[in-house]
Structures are given as structure tokens and as C-alpha cells.
């Protein structure tokens, strides 16, 4: 088995993945959302301190799963990029300690690659090559994945990410953090689902294959300010619905532009924000239009987790892509560094 560790942001997670068939044997996670909610976003120093508390607790649960028999573990895998430096280092320190004490090889794994492999948790075979949309609080990307070694970014956001824009709109409406599920719920409750959108679709007339949410976010801000004296529940529902609809339509329009160029046969949606059900439905329709197979990460593995890191690290294990302890470092700003 591979013991994998994820600590790139505000989720502490450990998992055990069986090497022979890619089955997830154990997966434990502690979310920090309640600790960061009062701040309206992730506080790096607080996240780091909580990882230092939570990772050892999760390791104890792993020990119980193993009946304290660590001989079943053949490698340690750790997310080392990208992410918050102060949280990545907490996971790396644990991984190094385990690698040294158990005399096991160390695998450094890319967080974004892990999200792609969330599509294949509990599955030995992948369906690569494929293209994928990764939407989260930190990223909005279109990726092309040929195999483990060859995953490249073909489109990214010029400013805010999809998930980040939901958090900021939620803050404008005084709804709480994290904003994604709250805004989605209000949008679902809005009574007039078929009325014309009140917000502009970003980059609608641009030929640039990219994402942008800053203009949409500013349009929401102006609408909130206009309604500030009477910002009741009905108005919050309306703004949430029109914002979410415009944001998803932007993803659809840009992805459709990509589809017309590349005509992918398989398309995946991954990342924490891919839990949004309206987004999933919109991409089902898009893929039907282009006769493209849609693959979705299971809802429980959309957010950051060690299970996806364990699944992706199986490929590295088979290829013996191990890293000496003295060369094992974090790289917070690196996105899908190419293999040499």
C-alpha cells in the first residue's frame, strides 16, 4: 500500500491505497472550514497550526487501520506543489519523518495532477488521454492529460478563480464562508429560473481561450450596492442565481471554444467547485452536444483529499519516481512541472 498525505491548503488528509488494484483501503480527513469561516477565507498561519495538530491525529487512525503493521506500506506520497508554503511544509515534515523511520521511498506529488486522478480513485485503469476542467478556490484550468508524465495546462484564469469568485460574492451578500455551497443553495431557491441573465458573460466576444471572473464580480458588487438598503433574502437569491448562471455560462462558452478546436473524446470535471450540481448539468449538456464522454470525480473526492494523491502516486511508484530525502522540497507556486 501507499500512504498518502495532503496538506496543500485547509484540509488535512491521509489515505491508504492498495498497489495491486488501486483500491482505497482507508481515507481520513479533517476539514478546517469552521476555523476559517469567521475570517471569510483561509488564514495560512492558522491553517498551518491546525495541520500540525490534525495530521498526527489522522496518523493514529491510519495505525488503527493497519493494526500497527506498517510492513504493508511500500511508499510514502506527499503533495509538495502547488499550495500554501506553510501548510505544504507540515505535510512534507511528516512524510520525511515516516520515510526515514520506516525506511520507505518518498514520492512527491503535484496537487493538480492529483485532482485529475480523482477521476480514477478505486479504478486500476485510467481513461487517458482526456481533457479536463479543474475548478476550485485556487484554480480555473483546462488541462490535457495524455498520461501521468504528460499533463499540461491549456487555459487558465486571468484573475480570480471560479471558486474564489463564489467566496467573494458570498462575502458581498454577507452569507458566510465557504461561499460555494451557500450561493448554490440560494440560486436553487430562486423562483424565476428562466428570466434573462442580469449580469454580463465574461470574455463573451473575446477570442482568448481563458477565464476571467473579475468583471462579473464587479457587476455583482454594483448590484449589491444598488440594493444595499433593502438587501433581503429574495434579492440575495436573485443575485446568487444570476451570478452563478453567468459564471457557469462563462465556463461553458470558453470550454465550447476549446471543444471546437480540439474535439476531445473524453472530458473530466474535477476540483472542489465541481461539486456544483448546476455546473455538472451544464457540462452534461455540452458534452452531449459534442458527442464527448463526460467523466466526473465522485462528490466526496472533489475537495482536496489524500485519496487522489494516493491514486496518482501509484503511477509514480510503478515508474520508481522516488525522491531522496535531502532533495525533497515544497514548491508552492509550481503548476504541473514537467518531468525531465
Curated annotation (Swiss-Prot):
Swiss-Prot/TrEMBL cofactor(s): Fe(2+)
Keyword vocabulary terms for this entry: Acyltransferase, Cytoplasm, Iron, Metal-binding, Transferase, tRNA processing
PROSITE patterns according to UniProt: GLYCOPROTEASE
Coiled coil segments of this chain: none
Lineage: Bacteria, Pseudomonadati, Campylobacterota, Epsilonproteobacteria, Campylobacterales
Name the record gives this protein: tRNA N6-adenosine threonylcarbamoyltransferase
Amino-acid positions noted as binding Fe cation in the UniProt annotation, renumbered to this chain: 111, 115, 304
Described function: Required for the formation of a threonylcarbamoyl group on adenosine at position 37 (t(6)A37) in tRNAs that read codons beginning with adenine. Is involved in the transfer of the threonylcarbamoyl moiety of threonylcarbamoyl-AMP (TC-AMP) to the N6 group of A37, together with TsaE and TsaB. TsaD likely plays a direct catalytic role in this reaction.
Gene3D superfamilies with a match to the protein in the record: 3.30.420.40
Compartment annotation: Cytoplasm
Broadest EC class assigned to this enzyme: transferase
Organism field: Helicobacter pylori (strain Shi470)
Co-factor remark: Binds 1 Fe(2+) ion per subunit.
Example of a GO MF term: iron ion binding
Family: Belongs to the KAE1 / TsaD family.
Gene designation per UniProt: tsaD
Gene Ontology terms: biological process: tRNA threonylcarbamoyladenosine modification
Amino acid at each position: 500500500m501507499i500512504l498518502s498525505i495532503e496538506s496543500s491548503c485547509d484540509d488535512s488528509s491521509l489515505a491508504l491505497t492498495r498497489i495491486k488494484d488501486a483500491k482505497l483501503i482507508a481515507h481520513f480527513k479533517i476539514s478546517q472550514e469552521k476555523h476559517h469561516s469567521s475570517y471569510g477565507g483561509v488564514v495560512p498561519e492558522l491553517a498551518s497550526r491546525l495541520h500540525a495538530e490534525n495530521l498526527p491525529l489522522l496518523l493514529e487512525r491510519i495505525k488503527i487501520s493497519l493494526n500497527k503493521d506498517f510492513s504493508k506500506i511500500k511508499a510514502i506520497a506527499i503533495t509538495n506543489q502547488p499550495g500554501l508554503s506553510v501548510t505544504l511544509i507540515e505535510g512534507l515534515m511528516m512524510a520525511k519523518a515516516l520515510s526515514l523511520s520506516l525506511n520507505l521511498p518518498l514520492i512527491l506529488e503535484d496537487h493538480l495532477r492529483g485532482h485529475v486522478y480523482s477521476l480514477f480513485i478505486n479504478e486500476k485503469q485510467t481513461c487517458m488521454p482526456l481533457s479536463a476542467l479543474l475548478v476550485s478556490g485556487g484554480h480555473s484550468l483546462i488541462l490535457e492529460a495524455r498520461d501521468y508524465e504528460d499533463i499540461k495546462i491549456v487555459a487558465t484564469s486571468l484573475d480570480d478563480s471560479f471558486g474564489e469568485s463564489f467566496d467573494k460574492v458570498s462575502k458581498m451578500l454577507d452569507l458566510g464562508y465557504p461561499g460555494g455551497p451557500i450561493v448554490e443553495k440560494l440560486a436553487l431557491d430562486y423562483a424565476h429560473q428562466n428570466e434573462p441573465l442580469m449580469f454580463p458573460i465574461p470574455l463573451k466576444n473575446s477570442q482568448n481561450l481563458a477565464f476571467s471572473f473579475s468583471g462579473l464580480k464587479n457587476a455583482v458588487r454594483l448590484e449589491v450596492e444598488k440594493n444595499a438598503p433593502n438587501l433581503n433574502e429574495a434579492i440575495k437569491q436573485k443575485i446568487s442565481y444570476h451570478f452563478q448562471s453567468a459564471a457557469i455560462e462563462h465556463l461553458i462558452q470558453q470550454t465550447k471554444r476549446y471543444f471546437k478546436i480540439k474535439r476531445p473524446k473524453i472530458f473530466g470535471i474535477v476540483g472542489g467547485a465541481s461539486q456544483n450540481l448546476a455546473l455538472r448539468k451544464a457540462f452534461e449538456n455540452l458534452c452531449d452536444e459534442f458527442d464527448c464522454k463526460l467523466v466526473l470525480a465522485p462528490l466526496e473526492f472533489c475537495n482536496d483529499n489524500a485519496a487522489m494523491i494516493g491514486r496518482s502516486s501509484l503511477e509514480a511508484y510503478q515508474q520508481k519516481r522516488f525522491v531522496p530525502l535531502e532533495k525533497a522540497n515544497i514548491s508552492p507556486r509550481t503548476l504541473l512541472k514537467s518531468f525531465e
